[in-house]
Amino acid sequence: MTNDRPLFIPVILGTTRQGRMSAPAAKLLCDEIGKRPNVATELIDIAQVPLPVDDAGQAIKDPSYAEKMNRADALVIVSPEYNHAYSGLLKHVLDSCLEEYIHKAVGIVGVSAGVFGGTRGIQGLLPVMRELGLVDIFWDVNISSVQDVFDDSGNLKDPSFLPRIDKFLKELIWMAKTLRYGRENIAAE
């Protein structure tokens, strides 16, 4: 069976800090996804997701965010690495949904000012992805020394990242198609 409905793969910008260097990376991923045939995307900036911080879980679910997660076939999470971890507010937003994520692909882009390209933050996110029911792909994109990768206008200065992003997106799209077929055609038990 084929499904002609375009895949929907939103990109989640996983930080709210001022001057965040993850924003150009998230925009780049949106641009690259947008070049793919039969794939739609949207940037989801967690700074724009209105969630209270004095409660947690599905009780605080934002209807717009939940609808996008329900519609998504896969996700790209662009996460900076802060002190060997991911953003606490990213976790807060992710935890606001549960069933919306089940059996959907996820790819993670790590961003850092240091040499590890967000690897430690990605490692911290992987068990969270599993607990949420997301299926992580085996390719990551690691953007190290992010301050040297994008210019002051947020444009990519280092085209060597494009083949990595291409490989990452090919795997994510394959997994998204496979999991969508399963969700739509195979009963979960």
Locate each region found by the language model.
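N-terminal beta1-alpha1-beta2 submodule of the flavodoxin-like/Rossmannoid cofactor-binding fold
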Residues: M1-E99, L156-E189
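Short glycine-rich loop/turn motifs that provide flexible caps or phosphate-binding loops at active sites
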Residues: L13, Q18, S87, V106-V109, ...
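Mobile beta-alpha loop/short-helix "lid" or hinge segments that flank ligand
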Residues: E42-V53, E99, L132-D152
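Short, glycine-/small-residue-rich phosphate/pyrophosphate-handling segment
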Residues: V106-V146, P159-P163
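His-Asp phosphorelay/catalytic-motif detector in bacterial-type signaling
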Residues: I102-H103
